Amino acid sequence: MRSTIIVAFLTAVLLGCGNAPARAVQQQEDLKQDWEVQPALWSPRAILIPHSAPADSAASDTVTLLDSLLTHSRAALSDSARGDSAKAGVKSATAAGRPKKRGLFNISPSDSALWPVKAPPPLPGSILPEHRIVAFYGNPLSKRMGILGELPPEEMLVRLEKVATEWAAADSGTKVLPALHLIATVAQGYPGPARKYRLQMPDSVIRRVAGWAEERGWLMFLDIQVGVSNVEDELKVLVPYLKYPHVQLALDPEFAMKDGKRPGTDWMGRMDASEVNHAIGVLARIVEEHQLPPKVLVVHRFTRNMLTNASQIRLDPRVQVIIDMDGWGTPGSKMGAYRWFVVRHPVQYTGFKLFYKNDKPMMTPQQVLELYPKPVYIQYQ
């Protein structure tokens, strides 16, 4: 009884009156009006270390960059706080690199032949494959959900730029774009007012993280854990945010519960290609209606059953789809999962997740770059 009262209190604090439909509709209308008068000034500011840069020079440049980051971050966060209170080029698809004959990761010729995937050519303004995205995952309201919330914002943002710079050095010549991957809809064991076993983040949290990304020229991902809700309903709430050019989308099948199961149990959730296709359709319409660059959609996966009928995912040039290998463990087990559940079920692009605490040991950028195809999306939790 006591735990129920505590959870209910926290829900009320986060969401005010809970998930009342009238409040959600009004919130979206206010948001829509706000965005309609704000020009889309965002443009990506990637990190690039040229092929020709000597190793010592690259390291020196990295140190100089990091020395200046803390001062910049403090000023930016101060400006953001005041604001809150006051109110392509196309890169060849083969650039992922053919698999090496020797190394940590070896795949068969038949698996290698699946890549690169036949897909619509990237449209102007596309993030992929010209960039590699390096993201910090989590939620600023929780220290247990990932590094995005585990560290103070100022420290977290500086650390993300440092990690992204390390990736740029490890794969010189490839642009690296940092990203903040926010769990915007959080699956939970408590049913909540809507009895959907999920908690929608309030506008203030989403806007805060979006502002951090926007002012730095980074990306932001809104991650949906639907609980016992569905992609269609949960996506409607986030559509206004997705009108920003730097805001992207992610789906987490692990917490898409079916057959009466609940989050937080031993049961694994799953999504079907039809649900992914719905998200692709929504994103494509947003891109078309608001004349935005193509969106990026990340779908987490670390078992075969998490994503059913993956071969039926319908690609659209306005949406670039990444299947992100989301499992933790030893390097060998992670590479095996990447081979079995991502490489052998090609969709379009690939991602790879790294866990600071659960990977034993955590793979280095150089080790991850041994994978084929090379992941274009790297996520840290």
Q: Over which residues does each language-model region extend?
A:
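Positively charged n-region of N-terminal signal peptides that target proteins for export
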Residues: M1-T4
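Alpha/beta catalytic barrel-like cores
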Residues: G18-L199, L315-V319, G332-Q381
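Active-site beta-loop-alpha junctions enriched in small/polar residues
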Residues: N139-L141, I183-A187, Q225-G227, E254-A256, ...
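Substrate-binding cleft of extracellular glycoside hydrolase catalytic domains
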Residues: E166, K175-E254
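Aromatic-lined carbohydrate-recognition surfaces of secreted/lumenal glycan-active proteins
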Residues: V226-V231, E288-M306
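Substrate-binding surface in catalytic domains of secreted glycosidases
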Residues: P253-L292
